[in-house]
Regions:
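Acidic-aromatic pocket-rim loops
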Residues: 104-128, 266
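N-terminal targeting leaders only when they are immediately followed by extended low-complexity/repeat-rich tracts
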Residues: 119-124, 131-132, 177-181
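Active-site core of glycosidic bond-cleaving carbohydrate-active enzymes
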Residues: 98, 124-154
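Acidic/polar-rich alpha-helix caps and helix-coil junctions
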Residues: 1-110, 145-281
């Protein structure tokens, strides 16, 4: 006789998941033998994301500080933002967990560039552009002038026929800019890139810790402001102004905007908007 086990309660499931991740943090190595393998840092990031979803900001702050203690020894903030997502940057120590890719088999490849490119883009012979993702113009307009994170976001281009393409004559660009975050893999073929897909990285630790401090204290501290400014400095921007740090609410708004600019096309925006109560706006 086949017997169905009773469904766990949410509390039982959460407790089991948390215990499993705590065991993983204890037992896994700090540095993986190969890209994409689980480590202490990756397990901490998964648990950190769980705590943030559940609103356990005290626990999340403690865990984020454990990751902060790994800076220099295991992780660091790369000086060049765009290097993180380049062929040369594969295996860089800002990345905590990645989907290891190559361009020898379709099921191991990064298709992000192919999914963004229009069919007439100059790279399209290698990338077989599918004309998919865009960065909406409203969101593009929230970036500050000189933000280095926009370096690989294309607002206009000359196509394979030598024609100038912009938002006035392209149905794709009319919707938004082209977020070519992962750039071109020179060895790309048929849209298959060998640049790793980033899942978690150290900049997320800094901004998450800043958010936790603000939520737990009720207002931004010097430490929390400094964590955000580290990310902004790498992007070529000035420090947050007085209005952005005047209250806990204002600082939360600044963090949410910074997270959007820092992590575009990395799959984090939906959970961020839900956590900040903005998803249904």
């Amino acid at each position: 006789t086949f017997v169905y086990l009773p469904r766990l309660t949410e509390e039982e499931y959460d407790a089991m998941m948390e215990a499993d991740l705590r065991d993983a943090i204890r037992d896994l190595p700090e540095v993986a033998e190969a890209r994409g393998r689980m480590t202490k840092g990756a397990a901490r990031m998964i648990l950190l994301k769980y705590y943030m979803i559940k609103g356990y900001f005290d626990k999340a702050e403690t865990l984020a500080r454990e990751l902060l203690e790994m800076e220099g020894r295991v992780y660091s903030l790369q000086p060049d933002y765009n290097y993180i997502f380049s062929k040369e940057g594969i295996g860089n120590n800002e990345v905590i967990l990645q989907l290891a890719c190559n361009n020898t088999a379709s099921w191991y490849s990064n298709y992000m560039t192919a999914e963004v490119l229009p069919a007439d883009y100059p790279w399209a012979e290698k990338a077989t552009g599918w004309g998919g993702y865009v960065m909406p113009w409203d969101f593009y307009g929230t970036f500050e002038e000189g933000d280095l994170r926009l370096k690989n976001v294309v607002t206009a281009y000359t196509n394979k026929n030598g024609e100038k393409i912009d938002r006035s004559n392209s149905s794709q660009l009319a919707k938004g800019a082209l977020p070519l975050k992962y750039g071109m893999d020179p060895d790309m073929k048929d849209g298959q890139s060998g640049i790793d897909v980033v899942i978690y990285r150290y900049a997320d630790v800094l901004l998450t810790l800043a958010e936790c401090i603000n939520r737990n204290e009720g207002s931004p501290t010097t430490e929390a402001i400094g964590l955000v400014n580290r990310v902004r400095k790498r992007a070529g921007l000035s420090e947050l102004d007085d209005a952005q740090t005047a209250s806990g609410e204002a600082f939360n708004e600044a963090i949410l905007l910074e997270r959007g600019h820092e992590f575009y096309l990395e799959g984090l925006r939906r959970q961020d908007l839900i956590r900040f109560g903005k998803y249904v706006e």
